[in-house]
Amino acid sequence: MAQDLVRILLATVLSCAVVAAGPLAPAQQPAASSSGVEQTTWTSPAVQSGHPWMPVLRWAQQEQAMIDGNVRDYSATIVSRERIGDKLEEYQSIFVKVRHRPLSIYVYVLTPESHKGEEAIYVEGRNDEKLLGHTTGIAGRVVGTVALDPQGSTAMNGHLHPITELGIRHLCQRLIALGNNDVQFAESQVRFLSGLKLNDRRCTGVEVIHPVPRTNFQFHRLRLFVDEQLKLPVRYEQYDWPRQPGGPPELVEEYNFMNVQINNGFTDADFDPRNPRYGFP
C-alpha cells in the first residue's frame, strides 16, 4: 500500500480538477461577526462528499495507517521556524530519533548556536510522563537534568507545540483534524503540486487555501510536501491571512524533515538519558 500513496495524490488531480479549481459556493451569504472575521454555514452531506478536501483527507488517513503498519521508528534532521506571538522566530534545527510504540522521542539541538547541545527525551508511560531535558554551559552543569511537564509553560516556552506532537505521524494527524473540520464548510480551494524538491529530493504536494478569513477555519493556506521515494510527508507550511488587504500571508509555522532514515531498530537505550553517547549530566 505504501507504494500507492503518492499515486493517490497524483491521480486525484484529474478526478478533482474541476472541484479544486475554485471554492464551493456557500449555501448563503456569510454573516460578518463582531470581530470582523466572517462566519459561513454548514454544508450539506451531499456537498461534503464532493468537497475538495476529500481526496486529501482520504490520503492522510491511508498514510497514517501505512505509518502505523510499516514505520516503527525513524531519525531525521528537522529544520523549523514558528511565529510566537507577533514574532516569526529564526530557523532552528534539531536531530531527532522517534519510535512510535511506545511513543519515544530524543532531541538534540543543532542550531541556534546558543542552544547547541541541549537534549530532551520523552517516553510515553515513563518518567511520570515528564520530559527529561538539560541545557548547556554553566547552567546545565549546575541545574543538571530536569523533569518537565511537556505541556507546561517552561517546556512550551518558544514553541507552538509540545514534544509529544513532534514528528511525521503528527503531520498526518493534524491534516486529518483540519480536513474533518473543513469538510463541514464550503470555500476550501485545493491544488495538487508536482515537480517539488526538498533538500534535492523529489516531492509531490498539496495546497489548501481559505480565501476569506472565517471563524470556522484555522488557517489561510497550508502546503504539505510528500517525499516521492519515502512516501512520507516531509514539509509542512501553515499561513494566516494577510494583516492588510492585498498583503502577503503570514507564515505561522514551517517544518522540514531532512535526512530521514526509517526503521533503524531503536531500543530503549536510544531514549535513556544514561546513554553514554548523550550529554545528560
Q: What residues fall within each predicted segment?
A:
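Acidic/histidine-rich, surface-exposed loop or edge segments in extracytoplasmic proteins
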Residues: 36-48
